[in-house]
Amino acid sequence: MSELRFTEDHEWLRVEADGSVTVGITAYAQNALGDVVFVQLPELQQYEKGNEASTVESVKAASGVYMPLTGEVVEVNGQLEDSPELVNEDPMGEGWFFRFIPADAEAVTALLDQDAYDRLLKANDDA
């Protein structure tokens, strides 16, 4: 399943072939932040759903990146340490933040699909 899933916090998730889940922030989120100047990546450890795993700082603000599901972070995108601008340049690709192994692999499917996320964005724009 390589279909993207999303959170209401504007994070995207992609299940990889090995069962790990890659996490990043959406184009909407990086646009709202503006130019990203620093990314604090998570430690390789277990995090509970909703806990702050990472921080992204921009010229406008600092924002937390929250663990979308309970699981163990197994890899971080070290490129972001030297090139945080990748979050702006390619938020859904090279600008990914971390990969984790979810405690419940099926829980990913309960997150927003593309249509549901698009409705969320429309509701935000209408508000």
Swiss-Prot record:
Residues 20-101 form the Lipoyl-binding domain. It holds the Pfam family GCV_H. It comes from Pseudomonas putida (strain ATCC 47054 / DSM 6125 / CFBP 8728 / NCIMB 11950 / KT2440). Gene3D superfamilies: 2.40.50.100. The gene is gcvH1. It comes from the Bacteria. One of its GO terms (cellular component) is glycine cleavage complex. The modification N6-lipoyllysine is found at residue 60. Binds 1 lipoyl cofactor covalently. InterPro entries: Biotin_lipoyl, GCV_H, GCV_H/Fam206, GCV_H_sub, Single_hybrid_motif. Belongs to the GcvH family. Keywords: Lipoyl. The glycine cleavage system catalyzes the degradation of glycine. The H protein shuttles the methylamine group of glycine from the P protein to the T protein. This is Glycine cleavage system H protein 1. One of its GO terms (biological process) is glycine decarboxylation via glycine cleavage system. The glycine cleavage system is composed of four proteins: P, T, L and H. Its cofactor is (R)-lipoate. The keyword Isomerase does not apply.
